[in-house]
Curated annotation (Swiss-Prot):
Keywords attached to this entry: Disulfide bond, Ion channel impairing toxin, Neurotoxin, Secreted, Toxin
GO cellular component: extracellular region
Function: Probable neurotoxin with unknown target. Possibly targets ion channels. In vivo, intraperitoneal injection into fish provokes paralysis after 5 minutes.
Domain of life: Eukaryota
Protein name stated in the entry: Conotoxin pr3a
Main location: secreted
MF term (GO), any: ion channel regulator activity
């Protein structure tokens, strides 16, 4: 999913 802060350009599955 998201490796770094979802604020960049990854899938916001950190929430």
């Amino acid at each position: 999913c998201c490796n770094w802060p979802c604020s960049f350009g990854c899938i916001p599955c950190c929430y």
